[in-house]
């Protein structure tokens, strides 16, 4: 640590922060012009450049967000109204006035002091700050860009090599967890591990998959292109406690989103209109939703967009649109599984279902559990449990045991409308033919009478292609497509 800065007249600046700034200013000799030009002309532009050099690790301007960001307590935060950056500019002005007294040449000292005195006028500072937006510009995509970094209260954890280091403003992290990490890799939370055993009813395969899935959610990438559904028909089954604990622990990295984000029925927005929910998901890792009576069907297009890893373009209110690569994993909690009208969600394995069959009876319920799990020492242990889950994920991926996979198979079959239609209204018949158009019309009548979603003709034919085992072949006759080996049942 260098000594505190001492001025020519013997004044010692005992604040380490301001002392370091004075040393930096003195090393730059901003008053020099001509042959020994410092590069900082005696103008608002020059002062904007000098301010940018001194505060580049503390203040940045993002044009897409129309906002300044300032760095404090290990994270970059939006500076609403440019309040904090304006205070930094005031500090800068005071430091420059102190520096004027350090200039050896009398004439230059007087002239430079006269120039710096003008910065006492707020209007001049406003102009300097406006010029500094270019000096300190940052693109929105530069924030939270590293998918392996997790910013804790006391430092940054790197999933690439499982190391922990001091905060670095050059990481440009705007997110931060709600706990301070410990360097003890063996730290654990026994109560959390007991809770996991309880909600999985001692099923080690399910507990292991849950740990790997939650560990995978720490990673800011969409490698697996999937979402997770926690399904429990009973009440008091632990789903909310699990998700709420992870949300609290991850802090800024977690977001509770409306279920309309992934369901049909949500109002379709004009692509040019604001999409604040989507915009708010940039940089998030853990996005949770709860079922709603308003929505009952998953929207395959939305889910494919949000889980596919492709760029998302969104616009917050009163801001310009930004494009970002999703870093989040979707988690849906529900008592009743939502309907799925597009079987491709199952074929592409985008849906992972984890059943919560435990029901905590009144005498088994711990009303203090959520608060207990969210204590600092317990969140540290839970975080390392997730890290160990990430390590397991790196080794074994998201492979599911047969029992876990059977849950998804049952879910798929219960939503297979074409198969249900065939079983109820059709039968195999060797050599029989039916027009594809007539078969689709029969399906529409069946779907409407059963209150089911009516697939488009294109999707219906695609599903029939997937169920090629239900008929002999598909052919054309006089330009009309036919299905061979199938006929309609007689309804009595």
Segments from the language model and where they lie:
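Modules that initiate DNA replication and primer synthesis
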Residues: 1-34, 66-97
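Feature primarily recognizes SF3-like P-loop helicase cores of small DNA viruses
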Residues: 31-67, 94-492
